[in-house]
Curated annotation (Swiss-Prot):
Organism of this sequence: Homo sapiens (Human)
PROSITE patterns (alphabetical): ZINC_PROTEASE (PS00142)
Regions of this protein lying in the Extracellular compartment: 107-1069
Protein name: Thyrotropin-releasing hormone-degrading ectoenzyme
Keyword Disulfide bond: yes
């Protein structure tokens, strides 16, 4: 990125060039002085320079402060000087020979120590500071041309500080034709083979020093060593070939912040097909931000304790050590960590040896890793304790957490299922887990739910710690699925890694899909892959992918900011949905064998999507089927969006239907605005499964491959009284529409005997109908007519699908005058089932009895709908339970509905209840309880309390950074707080963007959550005006937000009157 003041620096440099001769003497004096300077580690790092360091800028005003500093005079220059002495004083031939010999010896000496006297990125020129210094030495540089060849000659006057450079690339007129440091990707000329990384952590002032030795293979001759580095203060760089050839002279080095690379400029070209050893000594901060090597804290027995932990994915390893920070550059790692003996350290591999020192420090040396990428390297320094178990194959599994959490047994559930999951994946993939151990680390603060570091997976506490006495089934399910996801990554992502970030779905899509497959292994009765996958993955991502601003699951990465952008729900959830579709049309057993081959062939390496397609095609071929997987799947992965299939009965020919496909877009007007869509007529090869049925019978399933825009097909047994149903059990990633006659027949079937259709088909019909109506493909009454059958529905999934589909419609209508008509209609559909199911017993403890899961989740869903839409009995019950808790100080609220009761009570009752929940939020130590208490505070109808909570959310000592986003989003979902959250978001945007900007996934979640239910012309105008002043990395998220709000406004303009008219008639009959 361009830095402030860059043009001014160039002008100033031109002036300095004119004065160079006059200043030469002064420069040489300053160079000599600079060679002697050193300072204590990061003396000013936490002071004025800290802001510049954190912002990634140089933090310097001196022109060319980043340029290369002093290096020793070359051999040629010394020889020239001695020749002039010979000529001037007519020295004898013997004297000349003696001087020449001396010059040769000096030349060798300078070559050996050349790197020691070179300048450093983030460090200083002309001799290195002592170990631990900050490298703040004078010097700036330019290239001089003389008879002896090119060299970097420093100019005195610059001052480098931690996180800045003391060297900079040459000016435009001096640059070489090809500059490897300006490219997004590393050149590939060099490949790392092995890293020796030695760290010393100073937890008392949150700094660390490091020494990294990298063995690199030179593939193509080059004069530059370019690797990633950011926010590190480099003190010293050395390069050597091997013992026979010795040191390689270094001319200088500089940091290029636009691409976050360290460039080492050499005096000679490295030879291809040779190996070299690069040594870098550096210092850095243990950051307060949640990326790189960062710090977190917790309170134990009234004392605040700190820990250091890493988050390197996708591009943050470079903030902890200079490295080749791209997934393709796999290498082995040997890590050593020196820390105070009061702490323990963890990394990907087990500790091999620990060396204790008399001064209270210890150095842990970890075993060497297998080949791996930098982004899932990890380490941690903490005061935690652990529990452990061992798998059948001998893998040691440990869970590390705060001592009080371990003592309570909060990590026991995670430890238990992790052991089982490793055994499951080893059997399913037929590839053993590759490391001797797997540590699970629960930390108070983390930018994501979890990170799959190989052998050291890191989780935020809320996604791994579970206290059975206060945790609901819903919370247990969340914890389970996060753990299943991360353990899958030990194979998909860690063992086999995508070549580049454009195919991040190859790891995230598989891990997300296996969340449901792995949970089915743990709890077979839950039917996660066949049922819950629909509502939690398919329906959710199709909402996002139905926008004109969506993108393909495989998307180009053209600049550094694009890398963070690819980690979104399209990669995770659409990737998972496409994998599920692929597994279903291939057949699960063939698909499984294909995955086994894929992992075996590419283990410890990298793979691209074509490698997967080829392996799966071969698996099909061995099974006697010939499908070109790449041809089919490229259309689904390289095109954005998805199709809507429309099945029309042919009125002129019996047993004939017409099938059409078109790109589904929620807002048709957005399609005409998007240039990328105007000239594209997307087509997909669609595996359409189809059945014919009537009131008592359903035919066997048939598959039709639809590849054209319009096709005619003959269907057996299709008569006037029969209905058609497409995309059976919603295994395909598309929607299905029908003519109105067929919709009427399907609605009639649901009302007369819904069990003729499977649970998944019933849920699929509900979601398709609501989405098609929202986009204008169907009349608004069709989905509302479908849900009339729900009073007879006994299964959880259709209720869950209906609840999710009604939610955005409710938010579009909840601030309108005649909202009560919609509210009354929904209550009418819920009332019968609410009375039948009742409330859970007080003694229900969230047991994992599989038979109760579906029933308890159904009961919870119906109670939530009843309380949300104002059922009087539900409100009374919630108020009674809250009042009993306050008066008795005993919480007898059933676990599985606590969040509903807390929210309803805060909404209905007075400020004292809000204050009581606020007090309980502060006093509880159970992370699951803390989360639902905080969210309950956002349910208040009191705008003053909501404003108070929004302001408190910015205090990290009160609300954790990752929880603050949820607070703001939940206030925005409250009709009494939507405008407050929207105003707060705009007023505090600079603070929020600074806090979450680099964690783009969190920033996108915040932008979407605050804006998704804005639906007035005024709010749309405010959003567009706000966007005019912002063009940062979250610009794509704002574009999606604008499209969403435009679609909301358009729907209200076109359809709200139609909806209310129908509702009014329906309630009168």
């Amino acid at each position: 990125m361009a830095l402030d003041g860059e043009l001014g620096e160039q002008e100033e440099e031109k002036k300095k060039k004119k004065k160079k001769k006059r200043k030469k003497k002064k420069e040489e004096e300053e160079e000599e002085e600079g060679a002697e300077k050193s300072s204590s580690p990061f003396a000013a790092a936490m002071g004025e320079d800290d802001a510049a360091l954190r912002a990634g800028s140089r933090g310097l005003s001196d022109p060319w402060a980043d340029s290369v500093g002093v290096r020793p005079r070359t051999t040629e220059r010394h020889i020239a000087v001695h020749k002039r002495l010979v000529l001037a004083f007519a020295v004898s031939l013997v004297a000349l020979l003696a001087v020449t010999m001396l010059a040769v010896l000096l030349s060798l000496r300078f070559d050996e120590c050349g790197a020691s006297a070179t300048p450093g990125a983030d460090g200083g020129p002309s001799g290195f500071p002592e170990r631990g210094g900050n490298g703040s030495l004078p010097g700036s540089a330019r290239r001089n041309h003389h008879a002896g060849g090119d060299s970097w000659q420093p100019e005195a006057g610059g001052v480098a500080s931690p996180g800045t450079t003391s060297a900079q690339p040459p000016s435009e007129e001096e640059r070489e034709p090809w500059e490897p440091w300006t490219q997004l990707r590393l050149s590939g000329h060099l490949k790392p083979l092995h890293y020796n990384l030695m760290l010393t952590a100073f937890m008392e002032n949150f700094t660390f020093s490091g020494e990294v030795n990298v063995e690199i293979a030179c593939r193509n001759a080059t004069r530059y060593v370019v690797l990633h580095a950011s926010r590190v203060a480099v003190e010293k760089v050395q390069l050597a070939e091997d013992r026979a050839f010795g040191a390689v002279p270094v001319a200088g080095f500089f940091l290029y912040p636009q691409t976050q690379v360290l460039v080492v400029v050499l005096n000679r070209t490295l030879d291809a097909q040779r190996n070299y050893n690069l040594k870098i000594i550096y210092n850095a901060l243990i950051e307060n931000e949640l990326l790189g090597f960062f710090r977190s804290s917790y309170v134990l027995h009234g004392e605040r304790r700190f820990l250091g932990v890493t988050q390197f994915s996708p591009t943050h390893a470079r903030k902890a050590f200079p490295c080749f920070d791209e997934p393709i550059y796999k290498a082995t790692f040997k890590i050593s960590i020196k820390h105070q003996a009061t702490y323990l350290s963890l990394s990907n591999m087990p500790v091999e040896t620990s060396v204790f020192e008399e001064d209270g420090w210890v150095t842990d040396h970890f075993s060497q890793t297998p080949l791996m990428s930098t982004y899932y390297l990890a380490w941690a320094i903490c005061n935690f304790t652990y529990r452990e178990t061992t798998t059948k194959s001998g893998v040691v599994v440990r869970l590390y957490a705060r001592p009080d959490a371990i003592r309570r047994g909060s990590g026991d559930y995670a430890l238990h299922i992790t052991k089982r999951l490793i055994e499951f994946y080893e059997d399913y993939f037929k590839v053993p887990y590759s490391l001797p151990k797997l540590d699970l680390l629960a930390v108070p603060k983390h930018p994501y739910a979890a990170m799959e570091n190989w052998g050291l997976s890191i989780f935020v506490e809320q996604r791994i710690l579970l206290d059975p006495s206060v945790s609901s089934i819903s919370y247990l399910l969340d914890v389970t699925m996060v753990i299943v996801h991360e353990i899958c990554h030990q194979w998909f992502g860690d063992l086999v890694t995508p070549v580049w970030w454009e195919d991040v779905w190859l790891k995230e899509g598989f891990a997300h899909y296996f969340e449901f497959v792995g949970t089915d292994y743990l709890y077979p009765g839950w039917n996660m892959e066949k049922q819950r996958f629909l509502t939690d993955v398919l329906h959710e991502v199709m909402l996002l992918d139905g926008l004109a601003s969506s993108h393909p699951v495989s998307q180009e990465v053209l600049q550094a900011t694009d890398i963070d952008r690819v980690f979104d729900w399209i990669a995770y959830k659409k990737g998972a949905a496409l994998i599920r579709m692929l597994a279903n049309f291939m057949g699960h057993s063939v698909f499984q064998r294909g995955l086994q081959d894929y992992l075996t062939i590419h283990k410890y390496g990298n793979a691209a999507r074509n490698d997967l397609w080829n392996t799966l095609s071969e698996a099909l071929k061995r099974n006697g089927k010939y499908v070109n997987i790449q041809e089919v799947m490229d259309q689904w992965t390289l095109q954005m969006g998805y199709p809507v299939i429309t099945i029309l009965g042919n009125t002129t020919a019996e047993n004939r239907i017409i099938i059409t496909q078109q790109h589904f877009i929620y807002d048709i007007s957005a399609k005409t605005k998007a240039l990328k869509l105007q000239n594209n007529s997307y087509l997909w090869q669609i595996p359409l499964t189809i059945v014919v049925g009537n009131r008592s019978h359903v035919s066997s399933e048939a598959i039709i491959w639809v590849s054209n825009k319009s096709e005619h097909h003959r269907i057996t047994y299709l008569d006037k009284g029969s209905w058609l149903l497409g995309n059976i059990n919603q295994t395909g990633y598309f929607r299905v529409n029908y003519d109105l006659r067929n919709w009427r027949l399907l609605i009639d079937q649901l009302i007369r005997n819904h069990e003729v259709l499977s649970v998944s088909n019933r849920a699929g019909l509900i979601d398709d109908a609501f989405s098609l109506a929202r986009a204008g493909y169907l009349p608004q009454n069709i989905p509302l007519e479908i849900i009339r059958y729900l009073s007879e529905e006994k299964d959880f999934l259709p209720w869950h699908a209906a609840s999710r589909a009604l939610y955005p419609l409710d938010k579009l209508l909840d601030r309108m005058e005649n909202y009560n008509i919609f509210n009354e209609y929904i209550l009418k559909q819920v009332a019968t089932t609410y009375i039948k199911l009742g409330w859970p017993k007080n003694n229900f403890n969230g047991s994992l009895v599989q038979a109760s899961y579906q029933h308890e989740e159904l009961r919870r869903e119906v109670i939530m709908l009843a309380c949300s839409f104002g059922n009087k009995h539900c409100h009374q019950q919630a108020s009674t339970l809250i009042s009993d808790w306050i008066s008795s100080n005993r919480n007898r609220i059933p676990l599985n509905v606590r969040d509903i009761v807390y929210c309803t009570g805060v909404s209905l009752l007075d400020e004292d209840v809000w204050e009581f929940i606020w007090m309980k939020f502060h006093s509880t130590t159970a992370v699951s309880e803390k989360k639902i208490l905080l969210e309950a505070l956002t349910c208040s109808d009191d705008r003053n309390l909501l404003n108070r909570l929004l302001n408190l959310s910015l205090n990290s000592e009160v609300v954790l950074d990752q929880d603050a986003i949820d607070v703001i989003i939940h206030v925005a979902r409250n009709p009494h707080g939507r405008d407050l959250a929207w105003k707060f978001f705009r007023d505090k945007w600079k603070i929020l963007n600074t806090r979450y900007g680099e964690a783009l996934f969190m920033n996108s979640k915040l932008i979407s959550g605050v804006t998704e239910f804005l639906n007035t012309e005024g709010e749309l105008k405010e959003l567009k005006n706000f966007m005019k002043n912002y063009d940062g990395v979250a610009a794509a998220s704002f574009s999606r937000a604008v499209e969403t709000v435009e679609a909301n406004v358009r729907w209200k303009m076109l359809y709200q009157d139609e909806l209310f008219q129908w509702l009014g008639k329906a309630l009168r009959h």
